[in-house]
Swiss-Prot record:
Functional description taken from the UniProt entry: Acts as a guanine nucleotide exchange factor (GEF) for RhoA GTPases. Its activation induces formation of actin stress fibers. Also acts as a GEF for RAC1, inducing production of reactive oxygen species (ROS). Does not act as a GEF for CDC42. The G protein beta-gamma (Gbetagamma) subunits of heterotrimeric G proteins act as activators, explaining the integrated effects of LPA and other G-protein coupled receptor agonists on actin stress fiber formation, cell shape change and ROS production. Required for EPB41L4B-mediated regulation of the circumferential actomyosin belt in epithelial cells.
UniProt-recorded Gene Ontology molecular function terms: guanyl-nucleotide exchange factor activity; zinc ion binding
Cellular component GO terms, alphabetical: apical part of cell; apical plasma membrane; cell junction; cytoskeleton; cytosol; extracellular exosome; plasma membrane
Phosphoserine sites (modified residues): 921, 1289, 1291
Zinc finger (C2H2-type): 310-334
Residue runs in coiled coils: 1038-1148
Disulfide bonds: none
Biological-process GO terms, alphabetical: actin cytoskeleton organization; negative regulation of stress fiber assembly; protein localization to cell-cell junction; regulation of cell shape; regulation of Rho protein signal transduction; small GTPase-mediated signal transduction
Phenotype when changing residue 458 to A: In RP78; decreased function in positive regulation of Rho protein signal transduction; loss of function in regulation of actomyosin structure organization
Tissues in which the protein is found: Expressed in all tissues tested with highest expression in kidney and pancreas. Weakly or not expressed in liver, skeletal muscle and testis. Isoform 1: Expressed in eosinophils. Isoform 2: Expressed in eosinophils. Isoform 3: Expressed in eosinophils. Isoform 4: Not detected in eosinophils.
CDD domains reported for this sequence: PH_ARHGEF18, RhoGEF
Protein name in UniProt: Rho guanine nucleotide exchange factor 18
Complex formation: Interacts with SEPT9; the interaction may inhibit GEF activity. Interacts with Gbetagamma subunits GNB1 and GNG2. Interacts with EPB41L4B. Interacts with PATJ (via C-terminus).
């Protein structure tokens, strides 16, 4: 069994070599491997074994490895017993690209340690291992066939929760005595080295395997002495002995399968990585991995970490625990051993529970607290390791950078920024204050406070951005990459000045917020005034500072971004440092470009916020005015910043053009000088663009025109380079000093450039793309010509001596002007002080109503200020007022003073008022009012107020005027002159004071006028002298062009004034028309209102008439109903009478009707209608008259033409509205039917008697119908005349004529046949076998008018039916 294992071990060792071939060339011969016992095989003879080392060092080494490796060996017991998700494994075993790739890593297995051994050393070392270590079935070999294979497959620790507490407690305390020669890692090393979790596993596994190798010969001794075994027991042996033997075979199989999976994954990942890398790159990386080591404070170490609180046995400093690395996965940069803040990293062992105390370096062992191991699958860890191993960087290399962490400075910066923004964490003011407090405010107040809150909040963010730029990025670049201030200034120009300015502004905003807090609350506030702070921030010194600094910062924006991108591409240290800083929580994804952009845009945010504040501020308030002023100031700052940015962009564009210029390209000027591309950079760019140059042949040539400070360049592009254009042998460099710009006639896009140089005038015809471009170019060129320095080139320029003389004269002239201006100001100040003295004197005299002194003259245009005419007119009017006042008072005096009396003044003239200069009342010394009263009132004698003899007008020097000077007269007055009233004296003093002020103003104006006139005269003389010295033909042309431009401008101004006048006239006319239209609208409105009133009245009248008509209609309907009732009653009475009459007649005839027949013969009573139905009513009512003995004799034959006749009668009825006596008569006559006389004569034979009786009945029926109709017409029409006429027209029909009987009513039932012996009253006509059925008796239509004799003679006799 042991031989099989010995034979199997080299085979598995070889497999492990092929699986993970890691290079340990960097560790060969090192002190570290010598201390571990691995130095001898690489330098000794093949036959020498590692066991030849002294055994005295092994116990110390055992204790050391128990201290360093024991904390993690326990957690590797059951790495295959728990499964983790892929995502969790990836997260927990995350590797940093900056800490793995270029660091020489320790091997994972013992087999990998022997990869670099010499030829025979591998075999000898392996045999020594087998012979000295015993059988693998001992303590470490209980779980698998080989401890080497177990160490490879169980490289991931497991949670301590899976191990029972009794099994852990015996081995928690492991003694760690100091060991000589071994230098484990300490805190100072860990502070500068970023530790990855996978490296932790590598170091722990190697230490475990080395401890197994060196302690193989000690196991027998340790097993012999229980106490020693307990004191020197290794973690590897403890874990092997404490494990049960139930699942050993199963775990061994799992170990083998895990190893095979790792080998497969490794080969796959390696192939994928090596596909994208060149062999040279892989070779360089292998060399870098051998060369990169670092020794810190005497500790030669590799990367690793240790779980739980541990300390270095050499230096005594505590190890950096895994819990301290969890806050920053990128590692820590700490100096002087300061601890790092806690942050979780992808470690496999995390600190649980409370904080563990750090043990003393002199302690016997290390206390392990309650920790939990979180393990991942080995294949996922290996895959992640191989993916990041090829591209990672080593932090221990001198070519790499250190990693930032939140040291005390960063922590203080974080707290500072958080304290700044603590008050403005809410999104708006409505959410920052209490909800109840916000609801009590008005809507406008809430909106205003929201905008103010947004202003302060954005200011906090801006200050935070500036602090990040300066205190994070700039500080890191200075300390880590040793960037100079100039280099940092290229990235963040003037950032420190901007931070200072905005920090001060933010502090003032916070103060204003604190002042506006409600009493008893630290949240509720309403800021009433903010405009004053904005005005102070954007005006004065602060405003100028913001203009300057923002101009510099915004101008360098593009350059800073370009420089940052260049550094990011070329400097790998810079790239890594920026990446590490980006992981700071304080940065919050604010990169360098984002910071620069935010600072650049901040100045443009203020106008929007201030405008919104103004919209929610009440107009007319003080804050509204301040906000408006602040808005104007901000816009002015932005415009100036834009101008600086534009100037900077133009300079950048000029440098680009100069960079594209051909090195050999140059141009010769007319004066012989050469213009090269270096001369371009000494000037400023005004405008550049593509134009067309027209040649003499008429072709247009594309050129690039560049307008500089004093020249205009015409360039051409050739082979992607710019050269000076050469067209018609004209110089492409045009001087602006004598350039004239003219328009081309009939060409909207062309312009002439005329160079009036004495060496040779030239004219260029330039075309643009549009008329607007032409006008823009002409305007820019003209402004450049006006601002061009007045220097002549070549021999026509003034000599240096003459130029110096001219400059000296101009300097002296300016000095004279300044001195004169200073003296004028002194004169004005003296006169103002003199006026103040007068006022004080007047106040001392008791006058308190005097006006306050004003400035002697206002500033502005000297042509307006130095106009003394208005002042002189005002003074004359005041003098006339004083004269009239005094004359009005003295004219009421009763007498004049006597001539006697002493007087200190000059003799009075004859024209003066007698007695005025000498009043008999005593004078009051020092009284201003009394002295005024003694002054001569005449204008030509009045020179000023009393007690001011030094103040005189300019004409006081004229001979003879001395007697008119004011004098103070003190003489005893007479009793006859009354004293001046107090009111008069007060008014007089006020007028004299006003007159004095006007005269002082006049004097100051005259002084200023003199200075101004003399200065202008000297300037004109100087210009004339210079003009004579420089009078050349070119200057004359240029002066003529300027004069032409001035005239053109004057004409344009006149045209503009004319247009303005026309506009005013049009506006006035429009106002008149609008006023007239308004009046017309008012009149039309008045008329409309009148018409509305009339229409309203008419509507009311119509309503009344309609109501009256409705009332009359109802009365008429009522009367009509009564008439119908009366008609029906009359009809019933008539029918009753008719029935009685027939009954009476029938009673006389044989065979009376039975009673039931009489009852049936009673007709229904219904009123006749007006539409012709009255003809049928009597017919129906007369039906019983035909029922009797005669009716049975009639045959049952009816005439076929009876129905059409009735229909024709019915169709010819006249409507009721056209019913009258005349048309009724005509209608009845029109429907009469004529029968030949022969047919009628055949029926007259033996029936005269019956015909007479039936004719009489028909006549009575017809008469009764006509009577009813006539009564109805009389009721409706109410006309007696028509009644009489209708009665005369109803003449009786001749008895010999009979009307034919109408056909029987189809709705009436047929009567029963009478007896045969009854007499027949009907008649029958038999002609051609046709029988005429006798109809029931019916009334005949109205008879027609009898025919005349001639008609009877010409026609046959007919019978009318």
């Amino acid at each position: 069994m042991g031989d099989d294992q010995e034979d199997d071990f080299p085979r598995r060792l070889s497999e492990s070599m092929e699986d993970l071939s890691l290079d340990l060339g960097a560790l060969q011969g090192s002190e570290y491997l010598q201390d571990l016992g691995l130095g001898a095989p690489s330098h000794s003879q093949p036959g020498e074994t590692p066991d030849s080392r002294p055994t005295g060092e092994e116990p110390g080494r055992d204790s050391l490895f128990s201290s360093l490796a024991g904390s993690q060996d326990l957690s590797r017991r059951r790495s295959w017993e728990r499964s983790r998700s892929c995502s969790e494994s990836w997260r927990r075993l995350s590797l940093d690209a900056s800490a793995v790739d270029e660091e020489p890593c320790l091997p994972r297995t013992l087999a990998s340690l022997a990869l670099n051994l010499p030829g025979g050393g591998l075999k000898t070392w392996t045999q020594g291992c087998l012979s000295g270590g015993g059988t693998p079935a001992e303590s470490p070999g209980k779980e698998c066939d080989s401890p080497k294979k177990r160490g490879r497959s169980r490289s991931v620790p497991v949670s301590f929760y899976e191990i029972r507490s009794p099994e852990i407690s015996p081995g928690l305390e492991v003694p760690t005595p100091p060991v000589q020669g071994l230098e484990p890692p300490v805190l100072e090393c860990m502070e500068k080295d970023h530790v990855e979790p996978d490296h932790v596993l590598i170091v722990q596994q190697v230490l475990q395997e080395l401890r197994q190798y060196h302690g193989a010969r000690q196991r027998a001794c340790m097993s012999a002495s229980p106490g020693g075994a307990h004191s020197n027991l290794t973690w590897f042996e403890f874990l092997s002995e404490s494990e049960d033997g139930a699942g050993k075979n199963e775990k061994s199989d799992k170990s083998t399968s895990v190893k095979r999976r790792l080998s497969c994954l490794r080969s796959r990942v390696t192939r994928q990585k090596e596909k994208g890398k060149s062999p040279a790159h892989l070779k360089d990386k292998g060399q870098d991995a051998r060369e990169r080591r670092e020794c810190v404070n005497g500790h030669q170490l590799l990367q690793g970490t240790f779980s739980g609180p541990s300390s270095c046995p050499l230096c005594g400093k505590p190890f950096l625990s895994s819990a301290s690395l969890k806050e920053h996965p990128r590692g820590t940069l700490l100096s002087d051993g300061s601890p790092a803040l806690s942050r979780n990293v992808g470690m496999t062992v995390s600190q649980k529970g409370g904080p563990q105390p750090t043990p003393s370096p002199a302690g016997p062992g290390t206390q392990l607290g309650p920790i939990t191991g979180e393990m991942d699958e080995a294949d996922s860890a290996f895959l992640k390791f191989k993916q990041t191993a090829d591209d990672s960087l080593s932090l221990t290399s001198p070519n790499t950078e250190s990693i930032f962490v939140e040291d005390p400075y960063t922590a203080s910066l974080r707290s500072e920024i958080e304290s700044d923004g603590h008050e403005f964490e809410a999104e708006s003011w409505s959410l920052a204050v209490d909800a109840a407090y916000a609801k009590k405010q008005k809507r406008e107040v809430v909106k205003r406070q929201d905008v103010l809150y947004e202003l302060m909040q954005t200011e906090v963010h801006h200050v935070r951005t500036l602090k990040i730029m300066l205190k994070v990025y700039s500080r890191a670049l200075q300390e880590e990459l040793q960037f100079s201030s100039k280099a940092i200034g290229r990235l963040f120009p003037c950032a420190d000045d901007l931070l200072e300015t905005h920090s001060h502004f933010l502090a003032r905003l916070k103060e204003r917020r604190q002042e506006s807090l409600e009493e008893g609350s630290d949240r509720n506030y309403v800021i009433q005034k903010i405009g004053d702070l904005l005005v102070q921030q954007f005006s004065g010194e602060n405003g100028e500072r913001m203009k300057e600094k923002y101009g510099v910062f915004c101008s360098g924006h593009n350059e800073a971004v370009s420089h940052y991108k260049l550094l990011l591409q070329q400097n790998k240290k810079f790239q890594n440092l920026i990446k590490k800083i980006g992981n700071f929580s304080i940065v919050r994804r604010l990169g360098v470009q984002e910071c620069i952009l935010l600072v650049t845009q901040r100045i443009t945010k203020y106008p929007v916020l201030v405008e919104r504040i103004i919209q929610n501020t009440e107009a007319g308030t003080e804050d509204y005015e301040d906000l408006t002023q602040a808005l104007n100031l901000i816009k002015d700052i932005i415009s100036q910043v834009d101008a600086k940015v534009s100037e900077c962009e133009k300079g950048q564009r000029l440098r680009e053009i100069a960079g594209k210029m051909d090195l050999k390209s140059s141009s010769k000027l007319k004066n012989g000088l050469t213009f090269r591309k270096e001369d371009m950079l000494q000037r400023q760019l005004h405008l550049e663009g593509m134009l067309c140059w027209k040649t003499t042949s008429g072709r247009l040539k594309d050129i690039l025109a560049i307008l500089l400070t004093d020249v205009l360049l015409l360039l051409q592009e050739k082979d992607q380079k710019y050269v000076f254009a050469s067209v018609d042998s004209k110089p492409p460099v045009i001087s602006l000093q004598k350039l004239i710009v003219r328009e081309v006639a009939n060409e909207e896009k062309a312009m002439f450039l005329i160079s009036a140089s004495l060496q040779g005038p030239e004219m260029y015809e330039i075309y643009t793309s549009s008329k607007e471009d032409r006008n823009a170019w002409m305007a820019h060129i003209q402004r450049a010509v006006e601002s061009c320095p007045d220097e002549e080139e070549g021999p026509f320029s003034l000599p240096e001596e003459e130029r110096k003389v001219v400059e000296a004269r101009a300097t002296r002239l300016r000095d004279f002007q300044e001195r004169l201006s200073m003296k004028d100001q002194l004169i004005a100040q003296s006169l103002l002080e003199k006026q103040q003295i007068y006022l004080e004197m007047a106040e001392m005299g008791g006058l308190e109503d005097l006006p306050q002194p004003r400035g002697l003259f206002r500033g502005g245009d000297p042509s307006e200020t130095l106009q003394g005419e208005l002042i002189l007119k005002s003074a004359m009017s005041e003098i006339e007022g004083i004269q009239s006042l005094i004359c009005r008072q003295l004219g009421s005096a009763n007498g004049q003073a006597e001539d006697g009396g002493s007087s200190t003044g000059p003799p009075r003239r004859a024209e003066t008022f007698a007695g005025y200069d000498c009043t008999n009342s005593p004078t009051k010394n020092g009284s201003f009012k009394k002295k005024v009263s003694s002054t001569d009132p005449r204008p030509r004698d009045w020179r000023g107020p009393p007690n001011s003899p030094d103040l005189k007008l300019s004409d006081s020097d004229i001979p003879g005027s001395s007697e008119e000077s004011p004098q103070v007269v003190e003489a005893p007055g007479t009793e006859s002159d009354p004293r001046l009233p107090t009111v008069l004296e007060s008014e007089l003093v006020q007028r004299i004071q006003t007159l004095s002020q006007l005269l002082l103003n006049l004097q100051a104006v005259i002084a200023h006028q003199d200075s101004y006139v003399e200065t202008q005269r000297a300037a004109i003389q100087e210009r004339e002298k210079q003009f004579r010295l420089q009078s050349t033909r070119g200057n004359l042309l240029l002066e003529q062009e300027r004069q032409r431009n001035f005239e053109k401008q004057r004409e344009e101004r006149a045209a503009l004034e004319k247009l303005q006048s026309q506009l005013r006239h049009e506006q006035q006319r429009w106002e008149r028309e609008r006023q007239w239209q308004h009046q017309e609208l008012e009149r039309a409105g008045a008329r409309l209102q009148e018409r509305e009133g009339e229409a309203r009245q008419l509507r009311e009248r119509l309503e009344q008439e309609r109501a009256e008509l409705e009332r009359q209609r109802q009365a008429y309907q009522h009367d009509l109903e009564r008439l119908r009732e009366a008609q029906r009653a009359v009809e019933r009475e008539r029918e009753r009478l008719e029935l009685l009459r027939r009954l009476k007649k029938q009673n006389t005839a044989p065979g009376a009707l039975p009673p039931d027949t009489l009852a049936e013969a009673q007709p229904p009573s219904h009123p006749p209608s007006f539409n012709g139905e009255g003809l049928e009513g009597p017919r129906v009512s007369m039906l019983p008259s035909g029922v009797g003995p005669e009716y049975a004799e009639r045959p049952e034959v009816a005439r076929r033409d009876s129905a059409p006749t009735e229909n024709r009668l019915a169709k010819s009825d006249v409507p009721i509205q056209l019913l009258s006596a005349t048309n009724q008569f005509q209608r009845q006559a029109a429907v009469q039917q004529q029968i030949p006389t022969k047919l009628a004569a055949s029926t007259k034979g033996g029936k005269d008697k019956g015909g007479k009786s039936r004719g009489s009945q028909r006549w009575e029926s017809s008469a009764s119908f006509d009577l009813k109709q006539q009564l109805l017409l009389n009721k409706l029409m109410g006309k007696d005349e028509s009644t009489s006429r209708n009665r005369r027209s109803l003449s009786p029909i001749l008895p010999g004529r009979h009307s034919p009987a109408p056909p029987p009513d189809p709705g009436f039932p047929a009567p029963s046949p009478p007896p045969a012996d009854s007499p027949s009253e009907g008649f029958s006509l038999k002609a051609g076998g046709t029988a005429l059925l006798p109809g029931p008796p019916a009334p005949s239509p109205l008879p027609a008018t009898p025919l005349s004799a001639k008609e009877d003679a010409s026609k046959e006799d007919v019978i009318f039916f």
